[in-house]
């Protein structure tokens, strides 16, 4: 799981600091040996671009192969990503299914749809509920829900 300090297609104005987000991810995945947080982008110049990260990881771990996994809702803007053609030609693109009724991608994007249950919970939903002062209990692991809700960032 690669944590990005700043998505080039989004404003960083309303974003928690990198360390807080990293800590929350570590808390959530601590009991799963198959998941690991990667903070390599923290030291990259901003904005960080996916193709640079994948190239860097390939150089660090030449005996490993990597795929890019993103949510189906993100596929519509994939052709806006910097060097998206390089990504498509160099790494497999896997897409996690979402209940998504938005527009189709502007250009066809070859990808593999992961065979997984559709989960209606998204980071966008969680951020929206926190910003509105609504509970996120049962949407995130128990170990995290109170910490998130009580964080000064969400209490204004």
Task: List the predicted regions and their residue ranges.
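Nucleotidyltransferase catalytic core that binds NTPs
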Residues: 1-156
């Amino acid at each position: 799981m690669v944590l990005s300090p700043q998505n080039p297609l989004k404003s960083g104005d309303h974003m928690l600091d990198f360390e807080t987000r990293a800590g929350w991810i570590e808390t959530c995945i601590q009991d799963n040996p198959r998941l690991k947080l990667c903070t390599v982008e923290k030291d990259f110049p901003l904005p960080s671009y996916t193709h640079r990260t994948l190239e860097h990881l390939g150089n660090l771990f030449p005996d490993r192969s990597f795929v890019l996994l993103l949510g189906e809702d993100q596929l519509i803007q994939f052709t806006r990503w910097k060097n998206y053609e390089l990504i498509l030609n160099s790494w497999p693109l896997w897409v996690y299914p979402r209940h998504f009724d938005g527009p189709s991608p502007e250009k066809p994007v070859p990808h593999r749809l992961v065979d997984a249950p559709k989960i209606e919970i998204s980071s966008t939903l969680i951020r929206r509920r926190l910003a509105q002062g609504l509970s996120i209990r049962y949407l995130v692991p128990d170990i995290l829900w109170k910490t998130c809700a009580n964080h000064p960032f969400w209490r204004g």
